[in-house]
């Protein structure tokens, strides 16, 4: 798994550790539990008018990069039937990829083509190469695997498919989930079970200790945007449920 600069997570961590090699490290001790409070970053709670969400887990994800090859040529002198436009080849594959995701995931489809690069990116030149990313998420590892196995058949024959990142679905601890449900009940407010589609610290902590999460609504489902907003009363409700749950965890033997 490499980033846009071709650097792996391991390489980045090694470089980071070298910069701070002299910092003291805390003693490694067992962690009793981890609870994370976060905005939903989606519209589900807000549309349901529910102030609190107890998160059951986090969807798994597959990231890919697809590079479609064409032939750069003059935009005004090359007849249509003699062109090999890489961008058109890429766009034709989008419908097939979307149909695959729809068939496998139905209403739970989470498919995004978020990053594009077209070369030579000139107004008077046919695209010789078009590169785009695929972000596919689902809670069922079998669906993720099926998408992975069938994806290449959706692409042009000479397209280059690269896997960028993969993470299995995360299931949170049932006992911590039950404790958070009790915490929400203690606030006197309505709540519902919800699954996270975004990555959170809890996704990584779940492999080390019992873990779960609380969500509060995001107005209009907007996140990663200056318009991101959660009502202060809902923030208060989330903080109250978090405090209740932490006290309950602290009192456990």
Give each language-model segment a name.
Residues 1-142:
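Midchain, well-structured core segments that form catalytic/ion-binding scaffolds
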Residues 112-121, 132-139, 159-177, 203:
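A short beta-alpha structural unit
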